[in-house]
């Protein structure tokens, strides 16, 4: 062993012991002929003192610079009174260095690793990710991620789950996003697909009698990237047999409660279970942030006869919605603040943001301040009564197609709640249940809300006759407005699976071509089964307070799905393409 201790592990318990440390020079200081080195490794920092009484070590320390890799042997001693550092685990002690060996020199880093006040662009950090990872903040996040996966593995092992790997090279299936395709050299003209999830394989494992499966799986989706998306991401994938939806939710809830208690000291009570219809009605979101107590109220029925087309149109449209959002005590918002909120909802397609300020409700119309009151005067007091408005409140209105209203007003609810510090708690977990089985596309076709293997609550006959009314046995775990996990019970009979394919417009021929392996499995006695998957990256991001998934992944991609470190994706040699039977079309030269 090259070292006896980690830098960050030294405490007063090691005083008077001789230790050997290996790590990087975090900071070097020269004070009155004595050199101080802050040495850093994975576990933290320790101060090393080198004085001229050890000339060889002093000479080596004199040449050392930031990020040099050193091996230091010395004696642990208590720091002099008044020089302790309460911000370091090792802040009560220091190491008097006797021997120093330079294991590797370092060029000057492209950005300082010992000064968090200097703003470094994310692109630059990702280009030199091997240096960025050395920063204590990044090291701690990756260490925390390791603790999360370790706890999850132990929990699932203790509950009888088997860790089983599923293929990375598989075939394309319709799962909602574009596949990453891998050409086959042996089967020219054919392609593998990288898995968007292990969904079908884990179902086949249940048919195979594995009973309880889990995997920390890499998944791939070729989709537009946002702050919470990566082209490759990690999923905690879980499937069980002979458990119902309540059993599965209880099991996964227990794991989440243990995770937060053991790693953050946060104690959760029993998770609330909210039907999808209630979530959309009250919060305009299928992943509501319950830290914010504000709720939306439907008022379309009151707007049926008003002459104001902005309200009358959506009120009479079967696909429209008019929702009111009462914000208690926010009547003091200025016009410029309201204008900013109007711009904000515009991001989601809203054409405007109507509002009423309630100054003195006992005065009726005269006690209100609003540019829309004159258009809805006959029903305005009914509106305010329905939303429970009081003096000092402001009520916002969204009126449009239901999707636009939900997107805009749902986002506004959360933004105003945070802007005005209305959050009532730090963590708000819940389950959203009873999702619709299908949703209608613009061209009148049905598509799966989750995926085509989700078990409906309806019978085969009801699915065939009225798919729009079918609910699914699906459940999403939501935390602070973020979906951290989602799952369902699965279809386990051939008759139901064919009925779902039929509702989705998938012909028998197409189903056999794409899913023959699954359909065959259902012919041989599939058990009732279900499961879910957690997004590991998203979960760790929430638990560490990071602002982006990229901050909790060792080597992430950018928003354009590129890796600045390795410069992937990159062109390949012509002979490699030739072996794959692929020829690239030449791009037409741009006209000068």
Curated annotation (Swiss-Prot):
Cellular component terms per the entry's GO annotation? cytoplasm
Query: Which chain positions carry the site (Important for tRNA non-discrimination)?
Result: 31, 82
Which GO MF terms are attached to this record? aspartate-tRNA ligase activity; aspartate-tRNA(Asn) ligase activity; ATP binding; nucleic acid binding
Ligand binding (L-aspartate)? 175, 221, 450, 490
GO BP terms: aspartyl-tRNA aminoacylation
Query: Which residue intervals make up region (Aspartate)?
Result: 199-202
For the ligand (ATP), the binding residues are: 221-223, 230, 483, 535-538
Presence of the UniProt keyword Nucleus in the record = no
Give the UniProt subcellular location, in the record's own words. Cytoplasm
Where is it chiefly localized? cytoplasm
Key words of the record? Aminoacyl-tRNA synthetase, ATP-binding, Cytoplasm, Ligase, Nucleotide-binding, Protein biosynthesis
Which EC number(s) are documented for this chain?
Answer: 6.1.1.23
Q: Which reaction does it catalyse?
A: tRNA(Asx) + L-aspartate + ATP = L-aspartyl-tRNA(Asx) + AMP + diphosphate
Q: What does this protein do?
A: Aspartyl-tRNA synthetase with relaxed tRNA specificity since it is able to aspartylate not only its cognate tRNA(Asp) but also tRNA(Asn). Reaction proceeds in two steps: L-aspartate is first activated by ATP to form Asp-AMP and then transferred to the acceptor end of tRNA(Asp/Asn).
Its assembly, as annotated, is: Homodimer.
Q: What NCBIfam families does its record include?
A: aspS_bact, PRK00476.1
Q: Which family does it belong to?
A: Belongs to the class-II aminoacyl-tRNA synthetase family. Type 1 subfamily.
Q: What is this protein called?
A: Aspartate--tRNA(Asp/Asn) ligase
- The organism encoding this protein is Acinetobacter baumannii (strain ATCC 17978 / DSM 105126 / CIP 53.77 / LMG 1025 / NCDC KC755 / 5377)
**Primary gene name:** aspS
């Amino acid at each position: 062993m090259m070292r006896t201790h980690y830098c960050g592990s030294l405490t007063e318990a090691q005083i008077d012991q001789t230790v050997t440390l290996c790590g990087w020079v975090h900071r070097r200081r020269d004070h009155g002929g004595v050199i101080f080195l802050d040495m850093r490794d994975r576990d933290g920092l320790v101060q090393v003192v080198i004085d001229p009484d050890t000339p060889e070590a002093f000479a080596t320390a004199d040449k050392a610079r930031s990020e040099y890799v050193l091996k230091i042997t010395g004696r642990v001693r208590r720091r002099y009174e008044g020089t302790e550092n309460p911000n370091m685990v090792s802040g009560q002690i220091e190491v008097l260095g006797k021997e120093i060996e330079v294991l590797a020199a370092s060029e000057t880093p492209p950005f300082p690793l010992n000064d968090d006040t200097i703003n470094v662009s994310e692109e630059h950090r990702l280009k030199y990710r091997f240096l960025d990872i050395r920063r204590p903040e990044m090291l701690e996040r990756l260490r925390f991620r390791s603790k999360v996966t370790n706890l999850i593995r132990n929990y699932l092992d203790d509950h009888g789950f088997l860790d089983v790997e599923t293929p990375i090279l598989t075939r394309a299936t319709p799962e909602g996003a574009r596949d990453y395709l891998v050409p086959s050299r042996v089967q020219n003209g054919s392609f593998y697909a990288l898995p968007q999830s292990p969904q079908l394989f884990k179902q086949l494992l249940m048919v195979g009698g594995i009973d309880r499966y889990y995997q920390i799986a890499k998944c791939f989706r070729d989709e537009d990237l946002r702050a919470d998306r990566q082209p490759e991401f990690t999923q905690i994938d879980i499937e069980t047999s002979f458990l119902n939806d309540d059993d599965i939710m209880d099991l996964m809830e227990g794991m989440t409660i243990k995770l937060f208690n053991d790693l953050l000291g946060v104690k959760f009570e029993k998770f609330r279970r909210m039907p999808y219809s209630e979530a959309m009605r009250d919060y305009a979101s299928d992943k509501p942030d319950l830290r914010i107590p504000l709720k939306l109220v439907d008022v379309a029925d009151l707007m049926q006869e008003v002459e104001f087309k902005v309200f009358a149109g959506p009120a009479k449209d079967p696909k429209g919605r008019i929702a009111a959002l009462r914000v208690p005590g926010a009547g003091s918002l200025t016009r410029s603040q309201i204008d900013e909120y109007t711009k904000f909802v515009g991001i989601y397609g809203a054409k405007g943001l109507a509002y009423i300020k309630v100054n003195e409700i006992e005065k009726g119309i005269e006690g209100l301040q609003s540019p829309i009151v004159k258009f809805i005067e006959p029903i305005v007091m009914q509106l305010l009564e329905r939303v429970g408005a009081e003096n000092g409140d402001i009520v916002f209105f969204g009126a449009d197609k239901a999707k636009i209203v939900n997107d805009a007003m749902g986002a506004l609810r959360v933004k105003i709640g945070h802007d005005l510090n209305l959050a009532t708690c730090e963590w708000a977990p819940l389950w959203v249940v009873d999702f619709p089985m299908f949703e209608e596309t613009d061209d009148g076709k049905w598509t799966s809300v989750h995926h085509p293997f989700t078990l409906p609550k309806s019978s085969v006959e009801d699915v065939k006759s009225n798919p729009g009314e079918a609910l699914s046995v699906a459940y999403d775990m939501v935390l602070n407005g973020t979906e951290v996990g989602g799952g369902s019970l699965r279809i386990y009979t051939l008759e139901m699976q064919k009925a779902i394919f039929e509702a989705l417009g998938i012909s028998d021929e197409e189903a056999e071509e794409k899913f023959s392996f699954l359909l065959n499995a259902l012919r041989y006695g599939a058990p009732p089964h279900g499961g879910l998957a957690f997004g590991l990256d998203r979960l760790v991001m929430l638990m560490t307070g990071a602002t982006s998934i990229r901050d909790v992944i060792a080597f992430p991609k950018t928003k354009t799905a590129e890796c600045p470190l390795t410069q992937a994706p990159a062109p390949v040699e012509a002979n490699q393409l030739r072996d794959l039977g692929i020829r690239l079309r030449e791009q037409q030269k741009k006209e000068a």
